[in-house]
Amino acid sequence: RENRIRNALAELEQSDFDYVFIDCPPSLGLLTINALVAAPEVLIPIQCEYYALEGVSQLMNNIGLVKAHLNPLLDVTTVLLTMYDGRTKLADQVAEEVRRHFADKVLKTVIPRSVKVSEAPGYSMTVIDYDPGSRGAMSYLDASREIAERGAAPVVKGYL
């Protein structure tokens, strides 16, 4: 059961993809476990809010379990700070704590709290399609460039 996504992705090994992103819910259900088993890398988006830190702690425990029992190649390589509101001390404190814990894994780009980012899914659109010139869209493009500059982990057979 835990290998369904890995098996499906094996069909893409001969394709010319630089990255394959698997967007998962924050809960640890079968979809998330399948994604963690299939992937060599994890990108964690973290909201700059208090309770997000508690969720990250649980996620790291779960990643450790998957790494120990199902996918020894699994590694958190990238952390993206989201819903950042520079007007609040809390956002700065959360960002500082995340940077202290994850160090160079945290992207320099942060995604600001934005009405446009929040509205886009309601129209079944990405923020880049919904409002390409918005701060949120531009920040996501900056983050994607930063990820591309870092480069992907080498592909290991069976792990796309």
Language-model region placement:
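P-loop/Walker-type NTP enzyme "switch/lid" segment
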Residues: 1-18, 70, 120-123, 127
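Charged catalytic carboxylate motif
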Residues: 4, 58, 139
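Conserved catalytic-core segment of NTP-binding enzymes
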Residues: 10-115
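Nucleotide phosphate-binding site architecture
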Residues: 112, 118, 128
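C-terminal boundary of histidine-terminating zinc-finger modules
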Residues: 121-142
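A short, amphipathic alpha-helical segment
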Residues: 141-153
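C-terminal helical "lid" subdomain and adjoining coupling/linker elements of P-loop NTPases
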Residues: 152-160
